[in-house]
Amino acid sequence: MTEVNDQAGLTAGSLCTGYGGLDLAVMAVLGARLAWCAESDRHAAAVLAARYPGVPNLGDITALDWAAVPPVDLITAGWPCQDISYSGPGAGITKGTRSGLWLTIAAGLRQLRPAYVFLENVAALRTRGLGKVLADLAALGYDTQWACLRASDTGACHRRDRIFILACHPAAGAGLAAAADPGRRGVQRRGVRGILAGPPGPAEETRP
C-alpha cells in the first residue's frame, strides 16, 4: 500500500478523468496534487492539457501496464454510467460494457494499492452494481463509506443525483477528515465533508 507523505501533501491519480470535475473537488477540499490522469477522449484530453499543464495523461486505462503507473496516495474515478443509468440498457457492471470499466479500475487498484479511493457514478449504481464495487474494495482491504447527493444539495439549480464512494485502507491512519481544510478557496463541501466525517445517515442512503 502507498505510504502517505503528510509533509508533501496527498498525491492523486485520476482514472476516467473526463474534464476533471471530480478531481477539482477532491483537490480543493484536500489540497491534493494531481500526479497523473487517464482520459482517452481527445476533447476532454485537450481540456485536461490546458487545465493541468505538465501532468501526464496516461490515456486509455484498458491499455495500461499498471505495474508501470506511478503510485499515489489517492485515486479518483468517475467511470462511464451508460450501463448503470436507468435510462440505459441496464447491463450494469459486466465485462465488455462501458460501465464494465469498473473491472479495469479494480485491477488498477489491486496493483497500485492507494491509501484512499474516491469514486463517483449515477445514483442508480445502488441497485445496478454497488454490491460488486463494495465487494471488490473489501477484497482489497478497504473500509468503505458512501452517500447519494444531489447537485442541488450544494446550491445548484438542477437535481443530478449522484453516488460518491470513499474507500480508506486501515493502514492509512486516521482518515481524510483531518486533511479537509474548511478554509480552502471557499468551496462548498457539504457533501464531501459529510462523507469524510462519517457514515451517511439513512436519509442520504434512501433518496430516490
Label every PLM stretch briefly.
Residues T2-A8, L64-L74, Q82-P208:
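Class I S-adenosyl-L-methionine
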Residues A12-L64:
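SAM cofactor-binding core of SAM-dependent methyltransferases
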Residues G13-L15, T76, A124:
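Structural recognition of the beta-strand scaffold that forms the well-ordered cores
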Residues C37, L58, T76, F118-L119:
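Generic enzyme active-site microenvironment
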Residues W79:
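Glycine-rich, N-terminal phosphate-binding loop of Rossmann-like dinucleotide-binding domains
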